[in-house]
UniProtKB/Swiss-Prot annotation:
One of its GO terms (biological process) is cytoplasmic translational elongation. The gene is RPP2D. This is Large ribosomal subunit protein P2w. It comes from the Eukaryota. P1 and P2 exist as dimers at the large ribosomal subunit. The keyword S-adenosyl-L-methionine does not apply. It comes from Arabidopsis thaliana (Mouse-ear cress). Plays an important role in the elongation step of protein synthesis. Residues 88-98 have a biased composition (Basic and acidic residues).
């Protein structure tokens, strides 16, 4: 992922065809390690392709992947007494807000 991010940073920075050394420099600037094999693989896969098309293709693929949201939805209706728990949580949240607002300590940052 860091190799792809460094590649995109180079492209967004104006380098239409970043080299392996450019990507190594970007990753090295943040103190991360990188292996040359993953850089070469990425450069081979994206050579001659438009970055905007690659991003659009990736979005389509991610949209087709099922997310974990379906599991939570099917689990929620199975509990019969689930409706009573929700108001208790709201009351606790209100109490916490009051406690936080009482932490004035007698001074203001803007005075």
């Amino acid at each position: 992922m860091k190799v792809a991010a460094a590649f995109l940073l180079a492209v967004l920075g104006g380098n239409a065809n970043p080299s392996a050394d450019n990507i190594k420099d970007i990753i090295g600037a943040v103190g991360a390690d990188v292996d040359g094999e993953s850089i070469e693989l990425l450069l081979k896969e994206v050579s001659g392709k438009d970055i905007a098309e690659l991003i659009a293709s990736g979005r389509e693929k991610l949209a087709s992947v099922p997310s974990g949201g379906g599991v939570a939805v099917s689990a929620a209706p199975s509990s019969g007494g689930g409706g009573a728990a929700a108001p208790a949580e709201k009351k606790e949240a209100k109490k916490e807000e009051k406690e936080e607002s009482d932490d004035d300590m007698g001074f203001s940052l803007f005075e």
